[in-house]
Amino acid sequence: MTTDHAGKKVDVVVVGNVDGEHVGVEQARHDLHEEAAAAAAADHHATRGLAIGFLIREVMVEGLASFLVVFWSCVAALMQEMYGTLTFPMVCLVVAMTVAFVLSWLGPAHFNPAVTITFAAYRRFPVWPKLPLYVAAQLAGSLLACLSVNAVMRPRHDHFYGTAPVVVHGTRLPFLMEFLASAVLMIVIATVATDGTAGKTVGGIAIGAAVGGLGLVIGPVSGGSMNPARTLGPAIVLGRYDGVWIYVVAPVAGMLVGALCNRAVRLSHRIVAFLCGTSVGIAGSP
């Protein structure tokens, strides 16, 4: 106990033990470290939870997009087969409009395993855990779409709404057509994906037009799939696997080559711009 200048009594704690002071400082440091660790753990859990939420949403969107595209593609093909009310160009138009609508409404969905695999191969898309989840969602959406088509349309067993190579052309020509069409489609997709000026609506219309136009060209030979999910869903539900390997291998191989061509063109633009001393506003490509 002591007295200050005003004559008031003030309690003074005197620490006479240096070791005690050291222990107190260490305890304070330990407490601060634990508080920081707890805060970091809470932030980590919150961030992880948010990331999982976004991943679940993306996978659900992928499944929904695949369902819509495959459902309306199959319905249009079945209407042509059952009633003859739609011509093949009209079927392609329905597919193009569906793709454009889905991309404009849901945003940058793939709804095509070949697209997802290509973006992952060129490191524009994470392999784990998104790649298997996206592909699984695409196939699940396709299967559900085909089951829904059967429930709504009730086709006969001889009605076919999938894609299969035309018998007279064998397998070589359908494979080549699917390969080339998939390569061109990937060039369009990569261009839209890396063009910052193209919004969802414009990009959706461009990709939808490409799908419809290419389908119109190669449809008489291969059915115009360019999408493994579009073929695998009907093949599994209907139990018809004629040439199904074509529609798995050709789109993936074609899109890998298409992305490579797109990258080569963009690289050549950069080289020319560098040699000419100008700048070219070209974003990265798959």
Swiss-Prot record:
One of its GO terms (cellular component) is membrane. Aquaporins contain two tandem repeats each containing three membrane-spanning domains and a pore-forming loop with the signature motif Asn-Pro-Ala (NPA). It comes from the Eukaryota. The chain crosses the membrane at residues 59-79, 86-106, 133-153, 173-193, 201-221, 241-261. The lineage of its organism: Eukaryota, Viridiplantae, Streptophyta, Embryophyta, Tracheophyta. InterPro entries: Aquaporin-like, Aquaporin_transptr, MIP, MIP_CS. Expressed in leaves and at lower levels in roots. This is Aquaporin NIP4-1. One of its GO terms (molecular function) is channel activity. Belongs to the MIP/aquaporin (TC 1.A.8) family. NIP (TC 1.A.8.12) subfamily. The gene is NIP4-1. It is found in: Membrane. It is a multi-pass membrane protein. Aquaporins facilitate the transport of water and small neutral solutes across cell membranes. A motif (NPA 1) lies at residues 112-114. PROSITE patterns: MIP. Keywords: Membrane, Repeat, Transmembrane, Transmembrane helix, Transport. A motif (NPA 2) lies at residues 227-229.
